[in-house]
């Protein structure tokens, strides 16, 4: 069986694929293995899905290779764009279902999940528009040569996506890869496979030929490792932790030196100057850390506030965080649902305990909410020092630290005091301060008087240990193309 009927409070009953999507069909795994998908809201088993093993990865890669070397390689850019737009239209048509499935196995609030799907639609349409605009150039060197440079697809792309934004990452990865003419084998996160499989069911309906987009469910140490080290995969793209990113980079290097892009962890500073609109800043700082349950690689988990407004800010921020509704992801007023899994829940609670043990002050939160499901109260630590684990390490949950700074130079130094460099934010009414601090911060994205406002037209990625390459925007096309130089001799003689 490769599908099962499920039901959500938002979408009603629907058919949930559970197989591996290879060659436009849902199939069972070669070894017949399945694994449980857990509902993080109540800790129950939602269903089982088929687990991809190394044998299944081989089959999926072979399907992608056959498609790439066959008719897909000759497909016109215009038609690739049409197919991506068809897929975007189907996402839009099925927005309620896709959002509900996200909330079911990820636990995110349904209002946030709908926002994710809208962003998927925008992303797929954006890259659909790019498909026929990827151009080369002619370079003049000497009168007797004609030289041109063209962009070609890389080939078979392995893509490994995380559990925090399952469908959004699905679109971020597939959009540019397909626009550039590649084929794809995408592995969903084992915690959240359901949305990616429902999305895969739309691929055939959109008109894609068999083998162009393949979606498999499985574990990182098995299917992810097989993709990363596969000798017939030309490119691997990964979003997730820095620890796993290093493993993937090593696997790529020790196999066929496949190209790699990595979007990894973060410990992003959110800096509030004394001249900022304090109420506006508090709203964005709250959103910056507690959005998506704090499960964002770019979460603003290190808050730095200028000392003259520090006490006032802490009090107001605490009051704002306490208003965040934590609970059933399908309730209309819920802002924060459960953490994605017991493993993640336990990890976050360990960090909270470490903060307490180190002497930090819990301004609010610091506890589990309820006794069922992986819910954690929004947590703010004050009286922190830069050497504390909760300040240095990525927690990936609804936990932030808040500290004082005196001068602009102090803020910059504190902001850059991390091995990560994914994102940062500056809150100020002074344009000179905004520009100077933004330029000085070692981060791939800096927001000013806002936070988490990503857009598919804007490149996103990190400095330092936060990754290699950029997602989104025109920059992402470079992840999925290679450059070919052609030089044609026009004269007859070898020299002269």
Swiss-Prot record:
It is found in: Cytoplasm. Its main location: cytoplasm. The keyword 4Fe-4S does not apply. InterPro entries: Ald_DH/histidinol_DH, Ald_DH_C, Ald_DH_CS_CYS, Ald_DH_CS_GLU, Ald_DH_N, Aldehyde_DH_dom. GO terms for cellular component: cytoplasm. It is an enzyme of class 1 (oxidoreductase). It catalyses: an aldehyde + NAD(+) + H2O = a carboxylate + NADH + 2 H(+). It comes from the Eukaryota. CDD domains: ALDH_F1-2_Ald2-like. Its EC number is 1.2.1.3. One of its GO terms (molecular function) is aldehyde dehydrogenase (NAD+) activity. Keywords: Allergen, Cytoplasm, NAD, Oxidoreductase. Disulfide bonds: none annotated. The active site is at 263, 296. The keyword Ligase does not apply. This is Aldehyde dehydrogenase. Belongs to the aldehyde dehydrogenase family.
């Amino acid at each position: 069986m490769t599908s099962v009927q499920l039901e959500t409070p938002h979408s009603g009953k629907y058919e949930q694929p559970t197989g591996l999507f290879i060659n436009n069909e849902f199939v069972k795994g070669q070894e017949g293995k399945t694994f449980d998908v857990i509902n993080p809201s109540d800790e129950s088993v939602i269903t089982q899905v088929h687990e991809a093993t190394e044998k299944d990865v081989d089959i999926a890669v072979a399907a992608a290779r056959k498609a790439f070397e066959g008719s897909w390689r000759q497909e016109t850019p215009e038609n690739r764009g049409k197919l991506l737009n068809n897929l975007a239209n189907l996402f839009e048509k099925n927005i309620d279902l896709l959002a509900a499935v996200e909330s079911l196995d990820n636990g995110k609030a349904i209002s946030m999940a709908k926002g994710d799907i809208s962003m998927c639609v925008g992303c797929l349409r954006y890259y659909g528009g790019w498909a026929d605009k990827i151009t080369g150039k002619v370079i003049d060197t000497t009168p007797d040569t004609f030289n041109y440079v063209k962009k070609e697809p890389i080939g078979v792309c392995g893509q490994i996506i995380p559990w925090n934004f399952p469908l959004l990452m699905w679109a971020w990865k597939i959009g540019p890869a397909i626009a550039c003419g590649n084929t794809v084998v995408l592995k969903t996160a084992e915690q959240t496979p359901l949305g990616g499989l429902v999305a895969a069911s739309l691929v055939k309906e959109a008109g894609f030929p068999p083998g162009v987009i393949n979606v498999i469910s499985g574990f990182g140490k098995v299917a992810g490792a097989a993709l990363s080290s596969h000798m017939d995969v030309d490119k691997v793209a990964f979003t997730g932790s820095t620890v796993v990113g290093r493993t993937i980079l090593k696997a790529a290097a020790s196999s066929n030196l496949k190209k790699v892009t990595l979007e990894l962890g973060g410990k992003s500073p959110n800096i509030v100057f004394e001249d900022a609109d304090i109420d506006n800043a508090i709203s964005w700082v709250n959103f910056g850390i507690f959005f998506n349950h704090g499960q964002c690689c770019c979460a603003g988990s290190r808050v730095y506030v200028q000392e003259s407004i520090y006490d006032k800010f802490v009090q107001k921020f605490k009051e704002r965080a306490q208003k965040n509704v934590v609970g059933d992801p399908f309730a209309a007023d819920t802002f924060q649902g459960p953490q994605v899994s017991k493993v993640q829940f336990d990890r976050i609670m360990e960090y909270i305990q470490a903060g307490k043990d180190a002497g930090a002050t819990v301004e609010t939160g610091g506890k589990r909410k309820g006794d069922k499901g992986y819910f954690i109260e929004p947590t703010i630590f004050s009286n922190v020092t830069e050497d504390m684990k909760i300040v240095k390490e990525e927690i990936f949950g609804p936990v932030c630290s808040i500290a004082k700074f005196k001068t602009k130079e102090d803020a910059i130094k504190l902001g850059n005091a991390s091995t990560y460099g994914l994102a940062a934010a500056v809150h100020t009414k002074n344009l000179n301060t905004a520009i100077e601090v933004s330029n000085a911060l070692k981060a791939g994205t800096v927001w000013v008087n806002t936070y988490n406002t990503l857009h598919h037209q804007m490149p996103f990625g990190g400095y330092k240990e936060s990754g290699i390459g950029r997602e989104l925007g025109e920059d992402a096309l470079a992840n999925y193309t290679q450059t070919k130089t052609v030089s044609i001799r026009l004269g007859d003689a070898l020299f002269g």
